[in-house]
């Protein structure tokens, strides 16, 4: 069965290719009565769109979203919300010379074997261009969650060898890297400038945090909250790893260090990333994403053609030297979609559950 839909109650179905006429999405299950306009979605789309700095692809797409259905007089109706973003700056001729070649580390080879036919222009459906619809859908989820006091935010925590310490959220929206440390921006810019001169690319690490999440979200056993987050975040193009909380660092931790002890004043740590037993604890939800270097570089590489013959590949076109630079809004969107879906599932089964134990504050 095709995998173009995510969610159980709050569902997102997307369609469209990198060089097709448009991208579309159907968002179903959004509760009625939410005030919603195209501008609510456009804010996050503008954070993701290409061509916003010299460090990203120079493809110029306005990414202007149209709401086709599901909203009447400025409020959601509870019916499916149709979204559309038109592609306006395709240069398909850049790919005509490689239509019978497989770009190394791209999805060309695997799409060819899976479907027997593929849209070679810019990667077609496998292109990160598709993530624009995730961001649009995620903006709907973020707005609904915000009305409940839940805020989802992200930032870049590492670019290549450069680790970026968290200093302030205020810095994140003031630079092209979503860096929480303004003092690191000149170093990041210099690194990217040299990378472009080297005709190479680099990976990155993104951290995404949800605050205000109540205890109880997550559906053990198979739909645990951390499992659903890993599923959603790993579905983002170029993501090769996901950590929740301390993640792989917990391998070197002792139990006395890793366990998040409880006091009447709150948890003393958050190594679990806000999730215990697959269920939200009320602490901030923290996830980290590892994104690989983009494979579209002008440095020649070995590959084969559709006949299996060896070729030397030089990938032309307009590409991101670091896909992680624009990944923060995408990661936020996917976390928000997961949280709203889990919130609606919790509401559907356990809305009447009441316990006397107080909810511990976030530290």
UniProtKB/Swiss-Prot annotation:
Query: Which reactions fall under this protein's catalytic activity?
Result: 5-O-(1-carboxyvinyl)-3-phosphoshikimate = chorismate + phosphate
Cofactor(s) recorded for this entry are: FMNH2
CDD domains reported for this sequence: Chorismate_synthase
What the record notes about the co-factor is:
Reduced FMN (FMNH(2)).
Residues recorded as binding FMN, renumbered to this chain, are 125-127, 237-238, 277, 292-296, 318
- What is one Pfam family matched by this protein? Chorismate_synt
Please state the Enzyme Commission number of this protein.
4.2.3.5
Which sites bind NADP(+)?
48, 54
Q: In which pathway does it act?
A: Metabolic intermediate biosynthesis; chorismate biosynthesis; chorismate from D-erythrose 4-phosphate and phosphoenolpyruvate: step 7/7
Question: Keywords on this record?
Answer: Amino-acid biosynthesis, Aromatic amino acid biosynthesis, FAD, Flavoprotein, FMN, Lyase, NADP
Look up the record and report any one GO term of the cellular component aspect: cytosol
Q: Which GO terms describe its biological process?
A: amino acid biosynthetic process; aromatic amino acid family biosynthetic process; chorismate biosynthetic process
What is said about its interaction partners and assembly? Homotetramer.
Q: What is the similarity comment for this entry?
A: Belongs to the chorismate synthase family.
Q: PANTHER family of this UniProt entry? A: CHORISMATE SYNTHASE
Q: What does this protein do?
A: This reaction introduces a second double bond into the aromatic ring system.
**Record-given protein name:** Chorismate synthase
Q: Which gene encodes it?
A: aroC
């Amino acid at each position: 069965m095709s995998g173009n839909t995510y969610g159980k109650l709050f569902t997102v179905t997307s369609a469209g290719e990198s060089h097709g006429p448009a991208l579309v999405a159907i968002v179903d299950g959004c509760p009625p009565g939410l005030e919603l306009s195209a501008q609510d979605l456009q804010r996050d789309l503008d954070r993701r769109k290409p061509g916003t700095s010299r460090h990203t692809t120079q493809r110029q797409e306005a990414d202007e979203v149209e709401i086709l259905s599901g909203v009447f007089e400025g409020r959601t109706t509870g019916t499916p919300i149709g979204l559309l973003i038109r592609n306006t700056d395709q240069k398909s001729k850049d790919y005509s010379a490689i239509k019978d070649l497989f770009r190394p580390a791209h999805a060309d080879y695997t799409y060819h074997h899976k479907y027997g036919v593929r849209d070679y222009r810019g990667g077609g459906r496998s292109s990160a261009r598709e993530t624009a619809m995730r961001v649009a859908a995620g903006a709907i989820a973020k707005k609904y969650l915000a009305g409940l006091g839940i805020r989802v935010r992200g930032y870049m925590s590492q670019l290549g060898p450069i680790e970026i310490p968290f200093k302030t959220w205020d810095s994140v929206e003031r630079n092209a890297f979503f860096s929480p440390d303004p003092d690191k921006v000149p170093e990041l810019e210099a690194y990217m400038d040299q990378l472009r001169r080297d005709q190479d690319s680099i990976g990155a690490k993104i951290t995404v945090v949800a605050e205000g999440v109540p205890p109880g979200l997550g559906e053990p056993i198979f739909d645990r909250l951390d499992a659903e987050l890993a599923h959603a975040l790993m579905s983002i193009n170029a993501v090769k790893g996901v950590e929740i909380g301390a993640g792989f660092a917990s391998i070197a931790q002792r139990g006395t260090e890793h366990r998040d002890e409880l006091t009447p004043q709150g948890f003393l740590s958050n190594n679990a990333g806000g999730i215990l037993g697959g269920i939200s604890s009320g602490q901030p939800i923290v996830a980290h994403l590892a994104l690989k270097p983009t494979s579209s570089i002008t440095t020649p590489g070995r590959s084969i053609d559709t006949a299996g013959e060896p070729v030397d590949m030089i990938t032309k076109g307009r590409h991101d030297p670091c896909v992680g630079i624009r990944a923060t809004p995408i990661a936020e969107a996917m976390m928000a979609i997961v949280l709203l879906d889990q919130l609606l599932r919790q509401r559907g089964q356990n809305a009447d559950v009441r316990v006397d134990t107080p909810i511990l504050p976030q530290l």
